[in-house]
From Swiss-Prot:
Presence of the UniProt keyword Oxidoreductase in the record: yes
Gene Ontology cellular-component terms listed: cytoplasm
Taxonomic lineage: Eukaryota, Viridiplantae, Streptophyta, Embryophyta, Tracheophyta
The keyword Oxidoreductase is annotated on this UniProt entry: yes
Natural source organism: Helianthus annuus (Common sunflower)
Listed PANTHER family: GLUTATHIONE PEROXIDASE, PHOSPHOLIPID HYDROPEROXIDE GLUTATHIONE PEROXIDASE 6, MITOCHONDRIAL-RELATED
Signal peptide: none
Protein name: Probable phospholipid hydroperoxide glutathione peroxidase
Root EC class: oxidoreductase
E.C. code: 1.11.1.12
BP-aspect Gene Ontology terms: response to oxidative stress
Protein's job: Protects cells and enzymes from oxidative damage, by catalyzing the reduction of hydrogen peroxide, lipid peroxides and organic hydroperoxide, by glutathione.
Length: 180
């Protein structure tokens, strides 16, 4: 069986509802537009569940922006997925989330519509990410700012805890980008 990636996810994995005909993940961006994740094929991705009122917000957002600015022209992309499952720390509407991320933290990377990352209603992408790289205490996402690093082929390379600073994984990003 071929290794599954975030770009081509079969219907039978995790008994998910049928995926689109091309078996690609699709999510809505913060403006409600459908985005096929296959558009990021060939890029190194850092996929992060974010929140605006978390204790990790003020450290993670600026570091994510720094990484994005530094490597966006070398094939690096950050995909931010707001989530309100941890302490209700992302209560805003999608519009409020966009204003917060893009104005306060100058986020130029894609911000998606709010998703669930755990439970029966978890976003299919997050079900796949968690099954690909379980955490220290099982597959569940434990808090905001859990990060998944995905290579250019869509394979999940690593998972980082919320306490892991984005800048501390720069070496892993550089390795996947083949940057000295």
């Amino acid at each position: 069986m071929a290794t599954q990636t975030v770009f081509d996810f079969p219907d039978d994995v995790l008994q998910q509802p049928p995926m689109p005909a091309d078996n690609a993940f699709s999510d809505k961006d913060v403006k409600g537009q459908d985005v096929e994740l296959s558009k990021y094929k060939g890029k190194v991705l850092l996929i992060v569940n974010v929140a605006s009122q978390c204790g990790f917000t003020n450290s993670n957002y600026p570091e994510l922006t720094t990484l994005y600015q530094k490597y966006k022209d070398q094939g690096f992309e950050i995909l931010a997925f707001p989530c309100n499952q941890f302490g209700g720390q992302e209560p805003g509407s999608n519009e409020e989330i966009q204003v917060f991320a893009c104005t306060r933290f100058k986020a130029e990377y894609p911000v998606f519509s709010k998703v669930n990352v755990n439970g029966k209603e978890a976003d299919p992408l997050y079900k796949f990410l968690k099954s690909s790289k379980g955490g220290f205490l099982g597959d569940s996402i434990k808090w905001n700012f859990t990060k998944f690093l995905v290579d250019r082929e869509g394979k999940v390379v690593d998972r980082y805890a919320p306490t892991t600073s984005p800048l501390s994984i720069e070496k892993d990003i550089k390795k996947l980008l083949n940057v000295a």
